[in-house]
Amino acid sequence: MWKFFYLFALLFAFGIAGCGKKNDRSNQISVQPVKQEEPLPQDGEERYRATYVKAAQAFSRNDLDGALAALDLSDQAKPDQASNANLRGAIFTRKRDWAQAEAAFRQALKLQPDLPMAQFNLGEVLFLNNKYSDAREKFQNFLNSQPSNDLGLYKIYLCDLLSGNNAKADSFLSSLKPSPNSPIYYFAKAAEAFHRKDKEAATEFVTSAYRIYPPDANSTFADSLVEKGYLSGEQASAPQPEDKKLKSDELKTLLPPVDKADSKPKS
């Protein structure tokens, strides 16, 4: 989905061998050596890649300040890289610094207009700030290059639903059917029920999704409902007991194959 450089990390292992007689160490205190940072490569391209990897790793650990510091070094090594700007936007999104996040994603798209994830991420920032019309445009741009992406379809549906574009929202919702490949049907139904304040029905749709699909598949759809205050984080991530999960033979009956060609919202 996201066009990446293939990044290679060079790992060096240093071994220290003891010389001389074997000593009795039973009474000695073990001291852990201080871990030292490896020097950065001198070559600009290698330094750029190495520091980008450091930034991405820090982001995955939620070390956001460390990620920004590594990105600064990456920018110094090779300025004006769309991948750097996109990652910077993701960091500021996690910090909930919306202005800097939006600026970073727009910079990424200025540098590489066809970067799909920057389109999606910018749409997400606009969506989280209730700018549904602008968000829909960015999600549509993302879908133009990822036409079968259910998360993009779902985001466009939410923009229509929450902005009061009832005709498009209703049309898309009526086109959906349960699928073994994606929980979009259940979360779109849940969003519509939450929106009309039928919490009981909405919760049942969410519960059904978690009975059928893996947690990771559900979480990407549930996140939007959490951000909009419909679900708590605990509700969106709570695993279902094994005895409540559907078996594979039940899935075949419940989830007939569907053609998703008609599921794309009208632009």
What do the PLM-derived regions correspond to, one by one?
Residues 44-83, 87-94:
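Alpha-helical segment of the N-proximal tetratricopeptide repeat
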Residues 86-87, 121, 155-156, 188:
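Canonical tetratricopeptide repeat
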Residues 23-39, 196-267:
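Terminal, low-structured helical/coil segments at or just beyond the last alpha-helical repeat
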